[in-house]
Amino acid sequence: MEVKIMTNQSTIDKLIEMRLTAMADAFRIQMDDPTMKEVPFEDRFGMLVDIEYSNRKNNRLKRLIRQAEFEQPDASIAAIDYQSGRKLNKALISRLATCEYITEYRNIFITGATGSGKTYMACAFGMEACKHYYTVRYVRCLLYTSPSPRDRQKSRM
């Protein structure tokens, strides 16, 4: 019995060393659960792999969202308000939410009046791209459209 405990602990240590921490935690839980002894090895192993895989995907998504530096990280396509006065094309927004424009090497430019929800829309599209595991960087275009000092000097002449 003690040899088995040592072997299991050694296995857990190796999983942690290989950075399979979610799998190591799940393995500990499986070992402590008497009902798991009745589950076939292949099923138990599959559960461990699924847990590690899900954990890695979740961590990757969190990292992508954090690195995107969204102004509104809670933005969501599902929460967009399509009131008639806003003149939003729901079909177009749904199509853009699939992120096909990214595979086609296209960009999205969102224009509108102040307070119309441009930032929210941009963040919502960015969040959707993150959910498809694309790297996103949120940048305000104002930085790129303001005249340079050289342009201002030319306009004075």
Residue ranges and their predicted role:
Residues N107-T119:
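Walker A/P-loop nucleotide-binding motif
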Residues T119-K131:
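Walker A/P-loop
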Residues Y134-L143:
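Short beta-strand-centered segment that lines the nucleotide-binding/catalytic pocket of NTP-utilizing
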Residues Y144-D151:
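Conserved small/polar residues in nucleotide/adenosyl-binding loops
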Residues T98-Y105:
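Phosphate-binding P-loop
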Residues D25-E71:
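Interdomain "pre-motor" coupling segment immediately N-terminal to P-loop NTPase/helicase cores
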Residues A78-L96:
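N-terminal pre-Walker A segment at the start of P-loop NTPase domains
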